UniProtKB/Swiss-Prot annotation:
This is Photosystem II CP43 reaction center protein. HAMAP family: PSII_PsbC_CP43. It comes from the Eukaryota. The lineage of its organism: Eukaryota, Viridiplantae, Streptophyta, Chlorokybophyceae, Chlorokybales. One of the components of the core complex of photosystem II (PSII). It binds chlorophyll and helps catalyze the primary light-induced photochemical processes of PSII. PSII is a light-driven water:plastoquinone oxidoreductase, using light energy to abstract electrons from H(2)O, generating O(2) and a proton gradient subsequently used for ATP formation. One of its GO terms (biological process) is photosynthetic electron transport in photosystem II. Binds multiple chlorophylls and provides some of the ligands for the Ca-4Mn-5O cluster of the oxygen-evolving complex. It may also provide a ligand for a Cl- that is required for oxygen evolution. PSII binds additional chlorophylls, carotenoids and specific lipids. It is a multi-pass membrane protein.
Length: 461
């Protein structure tokens, strides 16, 4: 296979003739050089952690405590706040120092990783098998590959348990459902019941079911991490101690490109799940930091004008709108009292500022008349004008709303980016899976270059 006119281009001593890949194929040139591939991965990790630290400090430097996070284009500080750092009742930021510490720690870590990446890319051994057999591998060594899989699973399980530890023993996490409008809370009694935890997995992903994205309390979130932490660690130990069964050896393709395709497919699924989670879920992604969900902003508008007009003397229980349905309140098909108007489509929204006003049969008219608290009014008015809308030129908010702010919600950014990247990763999964299967079947010869017109043309220079 030939792509260069003269085939003489060398990059780092790894040329096309010796590897079968041109310079632009990147790490494909390192498939059989475990030491250099380690360097590439460690350097990549350094870049990732450097971005996290630098962006973290950038957000801290630009942060204005008097404005909500979601109005300031922040995507990292909301995550730190959700973990309970630097915030108090109602999600108010009371201390930015933990955010600064987080940024500095990531920057320092990135320097260590960067040094390791440069060392293994330029100085360390090209292959690890001879000097460090524990870290060496051959792609077709099925037992070694499942051992590496096991190590990864143990690390993932440990990561899940770190969140459990933070929530239960190290200061707690932010719970948007804490009474009075949210607060940092230690989760003392995480859900251990497997029927509850795995019931989420068995739910439909459609409609009001919402699969795992429907989780609506911190006990279930931390309990889920507890379960998944132990499952990942147990699975990791299993894969380290065992060899692949015969059916797995036959069914799977055992090559570097195949493992790449499996990984891309897994990340794609996680990206699509994250997209739905951040868009719909206001427990794992509290609206105090990420802005309201779409249904939440819509219901907030109905609630805000119900409050206003009720003060002006309207009978919100019986007033009719232009369609003859209830202007402020109506009944769902199953009889619950819900907000009227266009927001009826979001009647099953659950939000901490609204739930105290419900009774056994939907919204409670008596509570709406007598029990609405000022913090509920303020929060709904704020959410009403901060719907998670936005465009490519970063002009967000409701286009027809004169009180709206030009901003793009972090929910818009995070859900859109994860959807787009998840789609790209899915296409990459199909691409590399096809190549890996073709190579395993023995008919992947590359593109036929013998008759390519460009080969018979003069060089450009």
């Amino acid at each position: 296979m030939e792509t260069l006119f003269n085939g003489t281009l060398l990059v780092g001593g790894r040329d096309q003739d010796s590897t079968g890949f041109a310079w632009w194929a990147g790490n494909a040139r390192l498939i059989n050089l475990s030491g250099k591939l380690l360097g590439a991965h460690v350097a990549h990790a350094g870049l990732i952690v450097f971005w996290a630290g630098a962006m973290n400090l950038f957000e801290v430097a630009h942060f204005v405590p008097e404005k909500p996070m979601y109005e300031q284009g922040l995507i990292l500080l909301p995550h730190l706040a959700t973990l309970g750092w630097g915030v108090g009742p109602g999600g108010e930021v009371i201390d930015t120092f933990p955010y600064f510490v987080s940024g500095v720690l990531h920057l320092i870590s990135s320097a260590v990783l960067g040094f390791g990446g440069v060392y293994h890319s330029l100085i360390g051994p090209e292959t690890l098998e001879e000097s460090f057999p524990f870290f060496g591998y051959v792609w077709k060594d099925k037992n070694k590959m499942t051992t590496i899989l096991g190590i990864h699973l143990i690390l993932l399980g440990a990561g899940a348990l770190l969140l459990v530890g933070k929530a239960m023993y190290f200061g707690g996490v932010y719970d948007t459902w804490a009474p009075g409008g949210g607060d940092v809370r230690v989760i003392t009694n995480p859900t251990g019941n497997p029927a509850t935890i795995f019931g989420y997995l068995l739910k439909s992903p459609f409609g009001g079911e919402g699969w795992i994205c429907s989780v609506d309390n911190m006990e279930d979130i931390i309990g889920g991490h507890l379960w998944i932490g132990f499952i990942c660690i147990a699975g990791g130990i299993w894969h380290i101690l065992t060899k692949p069964f015969a059916w797995a050896r036959r069914a799977l393709v055992w090559s570097g490109e195949a493992y790449l395709s499996y990984s891309l497919g897994a990340v794609s699924v996680m990206a699509f799940t994250a997209c739905c989670f951040v868009w719909f879920n206001n427990t794992a992604y509290p609206s105090e930091f990420y802005g309201p969900t779409g249904p939440e902003a819509s219901q907030a508008q109905a609630f805000t004008f119900l409050v206003r007009d009720q003060r002006l003397g309207a009978n919100v229980g019986s007033a009719q709108g232009p369609t003859g349905l209830g202007k402020y309140l109506m009944r769902s098909p199953t009889g619950e009292i819900i907000f009227g108007g266009e927001t009826m489509r979001f009647w099953d929204l659950r939000a901490p500022w609204l739930e105290p006003l419900r009774g056994p049969n939907g919204l409670d008219l008596n509570k709406l008349r007598n029990d609405i608290q000022p913090w509920q009014e303020r929060r709904s008015a704020e959410y009403m004008t901060h719907a998670p809308l936005g465009s490519l030129n970063s002009v967000g908010g409701v286009a027809t709303e004169i009180n709206a702010v030009n901003y793009v919600s972090p929910r818009s950014w995070l859900s859109t980016s994860h959807f787009v990247l998840g789609f790209f990763f899915f296409v990459a999964h199909l691409w590399h899976a096809g190549r890996a299967r073709a190579a395993a079947a023995g008919f992947e010869k590359g593109i036929e270059r013998e008759t390519e017109p460009a080969l018979s043309m003069k060089p450009l220079n």
